[in-house]
Amino acid sequence: MSDPSAEPLDPSIRQAIVPDNAAGRRFDAVLAELFPEFSRSRLSEWIKSGDALLDGEMARPRDTLRGGESVQVQVVLETQTHAAPQDIPLSVLYEDEQVLVIDKPAGLVVHPGAGNPDRTLVNALLFRDPALASVPRAGVVHRLDKDTSGVMVVARTVQAQTALVEQLSAREVHRQYLAVVVGALVSGGTANAPIDRHPRDRLKMAVRDDGRDAVTHYRLRERFRAHTALECRLETGRTHQIRVHMAHLKSPIVGDPLYGGALKLPKGATDELVHELRTFKRQALHAETLEFLHPVSGEPVRASAPVPADLQRLMTVLREDSARAAELARR
């Protein structure tokens, strides 16, 4: 166990003594037990870089321990010092000392990058909680596309981040989305198709045989005349996954600028619906529900983000168009 009294004054240096009952075990495995707040991959990197020392000397991850050795770890974390805190309003659904759950609006980019140097979610997070500057990626453990709205969880400590990333990797985080797609689907199903970069367009992803496995479960929420509202549950979390899978199934998401294709107007659509479909300028996709285990207590946490006004409006107009068409058919 770690001995708090032996901690050096520098908070970035962590120390511990290898317990006697760890004799015969690998250095990397024991290190992961001594410092569970860090991921195994990160600890392994520190061993290889010399930032994790055994009796003051470099060691290998596979080295066998005797018990009683001293361990010193120089905590080296990438930070977000290049991102400036900016006062951008955030809708908080849940928060405590370990996690922050927010409702991201459409139009907000998660990370600064080319074309979006600031005014991002990371800038907003650093303003709300400056301590996130010491957490890798400002605590972001998963992303939503710029024009996808909805619920996201942010880790406020390295320990929470490690636990949440492990849950995501183990597919233990439940993520449900609302999507409005082109076409009147008759049933739900599962899209099980690998995804990788598009071979020609580097801005896009595509279903590819040599891609990474990707699984999306979907079921009908509401069926309109020529569109369908779906509940989509992610089993994996590939870039643009739901958007790519729906386009692959020939039912692209309404308004999707990358995968939607040419605008398709239902025959006899009302003027209101024509206007709504032509002016809906983002993918009709909303991260509605997120469920995970609290990284410290282990208790289940469930957060839901209300359907935003633009998506509610789209569904209302689709509903009214369907009702009008049904009424005309009865005459």
From Swiss-Prot:
InterPro entries in UniProt: PsdUridine_synth_cat_dom_sf, PsdUridine_synth_RluA-like_CS, PsdUridine_synth_RluC/D, PsdUridine_synth_RsuA/RluA, RluA_PseudoU_synthase, S4_RNA-bd_sf
GO CC terms, sorted: cytoplasm
Active site positions, chain numbering: D145
Occurrences of domain S4 RNA-binding (ranges): 25-97
EC class: isomerase
Any one Gene Ontology molecular-function term assigned to this protein's record: RNA binding
Protein function: Responsible for synthesis of pseudouridine from uracil at positions 1911, 1915 and 1917 in 23S ribosomal RNA.
Entry similarity comment: Belongs to the pseudouridine synthase RluA family.
Name of the protein: Ribosomal large subunit pseudouridine synthase D
Organism encoding this protein: Xanthomonas axonopodis pv. citri (strain 306)
